[in-house]
């Protein structure tokens, strides 16, 4: 029987796809609202270029899932019980710097934007505008526009509910 460490190690040593064949973006989704989690995952499953590899409902679970699965992207709510998304982002960005973190919030205050940026998030998506902003954010992150521009631009592209 394999130990937990062996299982984690073997799962992280998967063969890369053949050269020239892009692999799907491996995404972990974390939100304390089961309804919103279901909606977001439903939208993401429509995309062939995205593979949801894990879920969580609070910041502590986000850290554990990222440590176990090493996703390309962590999509996480800001306000959650036990540990906020911004607190989890600070830890994840220090220990797993290759994981891009995109935070989501219904709170579009300056304080929330500053907290997300300070924690190391690549972007903050305003939840009521998720559908519009998500793919714009992905393009900016993975096409090299940079985190600063992504977090700042979302302030001007938010739509009011």
Which residue stretches match the model-derived regions?
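Non-catalytic signal-transmission and effector/linker regions of two-component phosphorelay proteins
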Residues: 1-26, 132-161
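Conserved acidic segment of CheY-like receiver
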Residues: 23-36, 40-44
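Acidic catalytic/metal-coordinating carboxylates
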Residues: 58-61, 83-87
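Short amphipathic alpha-helix used as the core "switch/output" element in two-component signaling
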Residues: 64, 86-97
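Active-site beta3 strand of CheY-like receiver
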Residues: 69-75
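Receiver (REC) domain active-site loop signature in two-component systems and cognate sites
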Residues: 80
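Alpha4 helix (beta4-alpha4-beta5 surface) of REC/receiver domains from two-component response regulators
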Residues: 87, 108-125, 132-136, 140
